[in-house]
Swiss-Prot record:
GO molecular function: aminoacyl-tRNA deacylase activity; ATP binding; valine-tRNA ligase activity
Lineage of the species this protein comes from: Bacteria, Bacillati, Bacillota, Bacilli, Bacillales
NCBIfam families per record: PRK05729.1, valS
Record comment regarding domains: ValRS has two distinct active sites: one for aminoacylation and one for editing. The misactivated threonine is translocated from the active site to the editing site. The C-terminal coiled-coil domain is crucial for aminoacylation activity.
Motif ('HIGH' region): 49-59
Enzyme nomenclature, EC number: 6.1.1.9
Subcellular locations according to the entry: Cytoplasm
Gene3D superfamilies xrefs: HUPs, Isoleucyl-tRNA Synthetase, Domain 1, Valyl-tRNA synthetase, C-terminal domain, Valyl/Leucyl/Isoleucyl-tRNA synthetase, editing domain
The protein's assembly and partners: Monomer.
Assigned keywords, A-Z: Aminoacyl-tRNA synthetase, ATP-binding, Coiled coil, Cytoplasm, Ligase, Nucleotide-binding, Protein biosynthesis
Name used for this protein in its record: Valine--tRNA ligase
Role: Catalyzes the attachment of valine to tRNA(Val). As ValRS can inadvertently accommodate and process structurally similar amino acids such as threonine, to avoid such errors, it has a 'posttransfer' editing activity that hydrolyzes mischarged Thr-tRNA(Val) in a tRNA-dependent manner.
Coiled coil: 809-880
Length: 880
């Protein structure tokens, strides 16, 4: 390395540090998987973000965790593939493009299918570029040579292959079922696209008269407009109130239609009246009951949410207008006898905001039970998927054990077209990877597949499957770890697992690292309606990518939610700034040392031996914790080592030899500074890639980039437990003296007398050997160390391991003045404690104040109380 580069700018400026660095990494191909047979492969596929807009903080968190894992594994000598890509996000993207067209006064039907798809591809290209620029700002070590998109030709081929194979096995079928229907976009929705909101509604209590005139049966509903499609009333067969009515007939109000009373175990005798109206075309549970009792399915709505011909005089009315009118009519007929206000959870379309309608529709489905059974069996074997934290395995298995068939068709244009064709004359269905030969006689299904269908194949379709001889598939599949949020374990993780088992015969990933959701500093979910969302790019512009990454990675444990606050990001910036300043100091004192001149074989001080011991401990701890994905704990250990051990202690102690006359000691200290900084930057690199690369490039080093530098390993001969114990005692002594100085308001510049009474001669000897450090950091005019130190009047004392420190106050401070000053401080703190306690005992405040405000007040109470006790203790010591 050119020694002239061993200087760094005075100030830490993240934008300057991060500028052009990513291009250097990408152009150097440091992130590309090398297909090196000498190295063990390690694979991660990125959860593909939707091409609908900007990445949010959740994406930044998720991808930072993956980057940490892959950077570390690359440094550990693995042939790492971190495969990037994006999801076409069917309904989400189509909704965005349609909104754009509406602004131009157009609809997709004005353009036609081909032109609309052309428009959507243009949208995709624009936003894909934007997402790549955000990946770059975050510093993600992605292999762009293998980037994939869920509508790529290769992935489309895999989708068709899977559809056909499942169809041939009887696991894909076409049939009628109740699906989530969005009347605004006129398409089926997956469960994850339905957002539940509490809505003020009502229970409408009605009496359906028995045909024989012997009475009536009471039912209640929140959707009275659906009664027009009722085809039965159900009761529990063991219900003594109603079992004699099973098989009888009631007259459906308004319509005059006769419908049966059926007995079904599904009915909860304890809920409501114990009798329920059955509308098989508008409720999933009613649909199942209808199947069991062979009931007619009467659909009373159109796809746009208006009432159809079966709704009689209400035909053409909007469903909610119909509700109002039908309530009036039922009241007039005398069958509606009570309206009970009720807040209930109602599904809304994530895209359009419309109230979702449970709707009978002919759709394509995957028969889930056989696939789920295979996934459940896998978890009983050694080849199971390991969930981190493992509690999420129960969540996963619960979903798999209670699985329903999966509706996979969507009434959209953007997506994978269903590979099914219908003969124009005979109506015969043909399913195939390619179109039938006489294509002119066939019409392809107009629907597309649910986005999750292609996403479920992501780990292997991106590797070249169904070509099982593809080099990447053979080498890099199955993958090592999937990093994702707990909110999509069912919708995505579970589907990848059962498709992986079905089509590759093995789990698609060994581990699943689950993280939580990002919330604001009050613990609320980030949302547009609350206006509390944060753009990660804004955070990067202000504090740099490294500060954001470090906060995201170390701010919580696996599976836990993360509270975002700018104050916490600022504190990580302060950490980065501390590292920068410490590195500048080290480099300024290296005197142009080259990599070849590094020499750690010289005689070492206790501080040298201690910092090397602590480095070894940190390397081992960090490596073990990172392998368990405990990045919060990794961050804590790195922070403590860098801030406390290296910056606050070792660098200060290193100034003694660096500013001294002993050239051999100087050389050893410089070498240790360079070595510890180098190893520490490597440990920190996966978390703060830009800063560590910048510092490492200024250090004496071998190699082109820290991204491919070797991961640190503990050097056994550098561990010296005796020196570590000596240093621990030294630090205790120095800290205790500093605390006493602080308590009696005496600055370090003012000399003190210091007596150290040890419990054994050995401890006295150890302290005497390191006397220069005690003198350097406590500034005594007199220092006595021994076992026979006599008691001193009017002195402050402190106890450390094996010794008592005595610091005489005579001549150091005016004791009466100090007591007076402390008394004023005590009075002030007492008032603060009383003020906070008064607030916390106020019932009105406790009822009305937000939880976080109450917590803040409780924290203040604890803080003021602790400070008051400390001042009381000091006053007592001074008086005695």
């Amino acid at each position: 390395m050119d020694n002239q580069e061993l200087t760094m700018p005075t100030k830490y400026d993240p934008s300057a540090v991060e500028k052009d660095r990513y291009d250097y990494w990408v152009n150097g191909k440091f992130f590309e998987a090398k297909n090196d047979p000498e190295k063990e492969p390690y694979t991660v596929v990125i959860p593909p973000p939707n091409v609908t807009g900007k990445l949010h903080l959740g994406h930044a968190w998720d991808s930072t965790l993956q980057d940490i894992v892959t950077r570390m594994k690359r440094m550990q000598g693995y042939d790492v593939l971190w495969l990037p890509g994006m999801d076409h996000a069917g309904i989400a993207t189509q909704a965005k493009v349609e909104a754009k067209l509406r602004e131009e006064g157009k609809t997709r039907y004005d353009l036609g299918r081909e032109k609309f798809l052309e428009e959507t591809w243009n949208w995709k290209e624009e936003y894909a570029d934007f997402i790549r620029s955000q990946w770059a700002k975050l510093g993600l070590g992605l292999d762009y040579s293998r980037e994939r998109f869920t509508l790529d030709e290769g992935l489309s081929k895999a989708v068709r292959e899977v559809f056909v194979k499942l169809y041939e096995k009887g696991l894909i079928y076409r049939g009628e079922y109740i699906i989530n229907w969005d009347p605004a976009t006129k398409t089926a929705l997956s469960d994850i696209e339905v957002i539940y909101k509490d809505v003020q509604g009502a229970f409408y209590h009605m009496r359906y008269p028995l045909k024989d005139g012997s009475g009536s049966i009471e039912i209640a509903t929140t959707r009275p407009e659906t009664m027009l499609g009722d085809t039965a009333v159900a009761v529990h067969p063991e219900d003594e109130r109603y079992k004699h009515l099973i098989g009888k007939t009631v007259i459906l109000p308004i319509t005059g239609r006769e419908i049966p009373i059926v007995g079904d175990d599904y009915v909860d005798m304890e809920f409501g009246s114990g009798a329920v109206k059955i509308t098989p075309a508008h409720d999933p549970n009613d649909f199942e009951i209808g199947n069991r009792h062979n009931l007619e399915r009467i659909l009373v709505m159109n796809e746009d949410g208006t009432m159809n011909d079966n709704a009689l005089q209400y035909k053409g009315m909007d469903r909610f207008e119909c509700r109002k009118q039908i309530v009036k009519d039922l009241q007039e007929e005398g069958v509606l006898f009570k309206i009970e206000e009720h807040t209930h959870s109602v599904g809304h379309s994530e895209r359009s905001g419309a109230v979702v309608e449970p709707y009978l529709s002919t759709q394509w489905f995957v028969q889930m039970q056989p696939l789920a059974d295979a996934a459940i069996e896998l978890q009983k074997s050694e080849g199971k998927v390991n969930f981190v934290p493992d509690r999420f395995e129960k969540t996963y298995l619960h979903w798999m054990e209670n699985i329903r068939d999966w509706c996979i068709s969507r009434q959209l244009w953007w997506g994978h077209r269903i590979p099914a064709w219908y003969h124009k004359e005979t109506g015969e269905i043909y399913v195939g990877v390619e179109a039938p030969e006489d294509a002119e006689n066939w019409e392809q299904d107009k629907d597309v597949l649910d986005t999750w269908f292609s996403s479920a194949l992501w780990p292997f379709s991106t590797m070249g499957w169904p070509d099982i001889d593809e080099e990447d598939f053979k080498r890099y599949y199955p993958t090592n770890v999937l990093v994702t949020g707990y909110d999509i374990i069912f919708f995505w993780v579970s589907r990848m697992i059962f498709q992986g088992i079905e089509f590759t015969g093995e789990r698609p990933f060994k581990d699943v690292l689950i993280h939580g959701l990002i919330r604001d500093d009050q613990g609320r979910k980030m949302s547009k309606s609350l206006g509390n969302g944060v753009d990660p790019m804004d955070v990067i512009d202000k504090y740099g990518a490294d500060s954001l990454r470090y906060f995201l990675a170390t701010g919580s444990s696996p599976g836990q939610d993360l509270r975002f606050s700018f104050e916490k990001v600022e504190s990580t910036w302060n950490f980065a700034n501390k590292i920068w300043n410490a590195s500048r100091f080290a480099l300024m004192n290296m005197d142009g040392m080259t990599y070849e001149e590094l020499d750690l074989s010289g005689e070492k001080s206790v501080a040298d031996k201690w910092i090397l011991t602590r480095l070894n401990e940190t390397i081992e701890t960090v490596t073990q914790l990172a392998d368990k994905y405990e990045f919060g704990e990794v961050g804590r250990h790195l922070y403590n080592f860098i801030w406390d051990d290296f910056c606050d202690w070792y660098i200060e102690m290193a100034k003694l030899p660096l500013y001294g006359e002993d050239e051999a000691a100087k050389k050893t200290t410089r070498s240790i500074l360079a070595y510890v900084l180098d190893q520490t930057m490597r440990l920190l690199h996966p978390f703060m890639p830009f800063l560590t690369e910048e510092i490492w490039q200024h250090l004496p080093h071998e190699g082109e980039s820290i991204t491919v530098a070797k991961w640190p390993e503990a050097v056994k001969e550098y561990t010296d437990t005796e020196a570590a114990a000596d240093m621990k005692l030294l630090v205790e002594v120095i800290r205790a003296v500093r605390n006493i100085r602080s308590e009696v308001n005496t600055p370090l510049s003012k000399q003190i007398e210091l007596y150290i009474k040890t419990s054994t001669p050995e401890i006295a000897e150890r302290l005497e050997e390191n006397r220069s450090y005690v003198e350097r950091f406590t500034n005594p005019s007199l220092l006595q160390i021994g076992t026979d130190i006599q008691a001193v009047d009017k002195a402050m004392t402190a106890v450390v391991s094996g010794a008592e420190l005595i610091l005489p106050l005579e001549g150091l401070i005016n004791i009466d003045e100090e007591i007076s000053r402390l008394q004023k401080e005590l009075d002030k703190l007492t008032k603060e404690v009383e003020r906070v306690q008064k607030k916390l005992s106020n019932e009105g405040f406790m009822k009305k104040a937000p939880a976080h405000v109450i917590e803040e007040e409780r924290a203040k109470e604890a803080d003021y109380t602790a400070k008051r006790e400390a001042v009381e203790k000091r006053i007592a010591e001074l008086k005695n």
